[in-house]
A protein has these predicted regions:
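DNA-contacting interfaces and partner/effector-binding or oligomerization modules
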Residues: 1-160
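Extended mid-to-C-terminal alpha-helical interaction segments
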Residues: 146, 150-181
Length: 181
C-alpha cells in the first residue's frame, strides 16, 4: 500500500497502477482526528499484484532501502526522483512566515541517501529527528527556491521569490521608520 495526505498523489498513483500495470487498486480515505484532522489516502493492491508491480518497477522484495543506483546516473532522473519524493512526503511552509522545506521519512538510511542526492545539486540539506520520524530539510530562501526549480515547480518558485521581495520591502520600510523616530 501507499499512503499520502495528498489527494492528487493518491489519485495519480491509483490511475498509474490501473493503467500501466493493469491491476485493480483500492483507494481508501483515512479520517484522522489528530494532526489537524487532515485526511490521509491509502492506495492498496493485493499481495500478488504488489509483487507484480514491484517487479515491474525493478524493485526486489526485501531489497535494502535507499535511492536506486539507476536514479542517480542521469540528472533528469535525479530531478524526477526528488519531485516524486517531495510529492509523497514533502511540504513547504508559507514564505510570508518562514522559509522551510522538509521531507518527513520513516527510514533513517533513506533520509541519509536523500540528503546525499540533494547535495549533488549543491544544496545543503540537514537531517533531524522528530519523534519516530526523520526529517530532511532546507532552511534558506535561495536553497528552497533552487529546490523548487529542481522539482519543476516554477510558479511556486516565483511565488516564493515574490513573497521574499515583499517581506524585504516591508522590513526596509520598517527600518527606515524606526531610524527616523
Amino acid at each position: 500500500s501507499i499512503e499520502t495526505e495528498n489527494n492528487a498523489v493518491a489519485r495519480r498513483t491509483f490511475r498509474l497502477l490501473r493503467d500501466v500495470f493493469d491491476v485493480q487498486p483500492e483507494l481508501v480515505t483515512l479520517r484522522r482526528s489528530r494532526l489537524g484532522g487532515r485526511n490521509a489516502y491509502r492506495v492498496e493492491i493485493s499481495g500478488s499484484e504488489a509483487s507484480f508491480v514491484l517487479e515491474g518497477c525493478g524493485i526486489e522484495v526485501g531489497q535494502r532501502r535507499g535511492v536506486p543506483r539507476e536514479i542517480t546516473v542521469r540528472k533528469c532522473c535525479r530531478m524526477s526522483f526528488l519531485r516524486g519524493v517531495f510529492l509523497a512526503c514533502g511540504s513547504v511552509t508559507d514564505p510570508e512566515k518562514e522559509y522551510h522545506l522538509e521531507f518527513v521519512l520513516e527510514d533513517e538510511s533513506f533520509a541519509a541517501a536523500l540528503q546525499r542526492l540533494i547535495a549533488r545539486f549543491s544544496l545543503n540539506a540537514h537531517v533531524a529527528k522528530r519523534r519516530s520520524m526523520t526529517l530532511v530539510y532546507l532552511k534558506g530562501q535561495s536553497e528552497i527556491t533552487d529546490m523548487l526549480s529542481i522539482f519543476g515547480a516554477q510558479s511556486a518558485r516565483f511565488a516564493m521569490e515574490d513573497a521574499y521581495i515583499r517581506k524585504e520591502l516591508r522590513n526596509n520600510a520598517n527600518r527606515a521608520v524606526n531610524c527616523d523616530s
